[in-house]
């Protein structure tokens, strides 16, 4: 169920401060964050945000299409290695 419109988007304050500083300085370095739950705001467009996936920080270049989504949607936490091969098909 989506968040109520009267509450507005959620973003961690420490991440918002880092984004504001990066926009102000026109900094090209990735902004490192562990906050996967924060929503992508229009002021983040064009920034590279390094989102933690539980093991490492995955760089995510924010585009216009990503606004309104959560940061965690773009940094996969699980590694898919494929299903086991069918033993009958090998013969």
Swiss-Prot record:
Keywords tagged on the record: Ribonucleoprotein, Ribosomal protein, RNA-binding, rRNA-binding
Q: By its UniProt entry, which PROSITE patterns does this protein fall under?
A: RIBOSOMAL_S19
GO BP terms: ribosomal small subunit assembly; translation
Q: Which GO terms describe its cellular component?
A: cytoplasm; small ribosomal subunit
In the record, what terms sit under GO molecular function? rRNA binding; structural constituent of ribosome
Give a yes or no for keyword Flavoprotein in this entry: no
Q: Which domain of life is it from?
A: Bacteria
PANTHER family associated with the record: RIBOSOMAL PROTEIN S19P FAMILY MEMBER, SMALL RIBOSOMAL SUBUNIT PROTEIN US19M
* Protein role: Protein S19 forms a complex with S13 that binds strongly to the 16S ribosomal RNA.
Family, as annotated: Belongs to the universal ribosomal protein uS19 family.
List the protein's name. Answer: Small ribosomal subunit protein uS19
- Where is the organism placed in the taxonomic lineage, from the top? Bacteria, Pseudomonadati, Pseudomonadota, Gammaproteobacteria, Pseudomonadales
